[in-house]
Amino acid sequence: MAKKGKKYADALKLVDRDTAYQAEEALELVKKTSVAKFDETVEVAVRLGVDPKKADQQIRGAVVLPHGTGKTQRVLVFAKGEKAKEAEAAGADYVGEDDLINKINQGWFDFDVIVATPDMMAQVGRLGRVLGPKGLMPNPKTGTVTFDVTKAVEEIKAGKVEYRVDKSGNIHVPIGKVSFDTPKLLENFQTIVETLHKVKPAAAKGTYVKNIAVASTMGPGIRVTTTAFAK
């Protein structure tokens, strides 16, 4: 434990907590300050100038990162007939109806994302109490309630990530692994920030992007300058 503590302390010395770095430099620091023995996930945290309590300032959606997240998502699809066949052909890990609903009710959660066709939502809706708290409930805003199951599955497998503002106005999104080259992390980072600007609520007043930070799973948070993104 002492050795790990020293590594973390040494990593902290590389970061000036009072400095907001350019995005590329911040991401390079994330890689340098990674001290874990596993390939840590790199996450971006954005503080937005919105009031999530107001319906017209809630932000939720999904975007395909150009270089993915470094993690293969296990996709479960609720569909029947031809749509079930399409989901299987697209690479879904699990496809079914009541059989999968029963498994989930019994405590099975060996999947990361759920896609459902609209005609299945009445049945899937019964899982709300189980899926809701885990953030697994399919939603049209994230493209996971759709008849185009082929596109949905392929995008998720290609690196689609969901984003959602929390009660404090923050959004946390994974943008890759510390093993990624900095340019790839930077492109994923820019994709997230650009996407958040595209979905800026008309009702949001004042500074929109208030704060940005990046960090690895076990590493320190590193501030990113918002000069280019604040408006």
UniProtKB/Swiss-Prot annotation:
Top-level taxon: Bacteria
GO biological process: regulation of translation; translation
Gene3D superfamilies named in the record: 3.30.190.20, 3.40.50.790
InterPro entries, alphabetized: Ribosom_uL1_bac-type (IPR005878), Ribosomal_uL1 (IPR002143), Ribosomal_uL1-like (IPR023674), Ribosomal_uL1/biogenesis (IPR028364), Ribosomal_uL1_3-a/b-sand (IPR016095), Ribosomal_uL1_CS (IPR023673)
Xref: CDD domains: Ribosomal_L1 (cd00403)
Annotated Gene Ontology cellular component terms: large ribosomal subunit
TM helices/strands, residue ranges: none
GO molecular function, one term: rRNA binding
Assigned keywords, A-Z: Repressor, Ribonucleoprotein, Ribosomal protein, RNA-binding, rRNA-binding, Translation regulation, tRNA-binding
Protein family: Belongs to the universal ribosomal protein uL1 family.
PANTHER family: 54S RIBOSOMAL PROTEIN L1, MITOCHONDRIAL, LARGE RIBOSOMAL SUBUNIT PROTEIN UL1M
Functional description taken from the UniProt entry: Binds directly to 23S rRNA. The L1 stalk is quite mobile in the ribosome, and is involved in E site tRNA release.
Quaternary structure, from the entry: Part of the 50S ribosomal subunit.
Protein's name in the database: Large ribosomal subunit protein uL1
Source species taxonomy: Bacteria, Bacillati, Bacillota, Bacilli, Bacillales
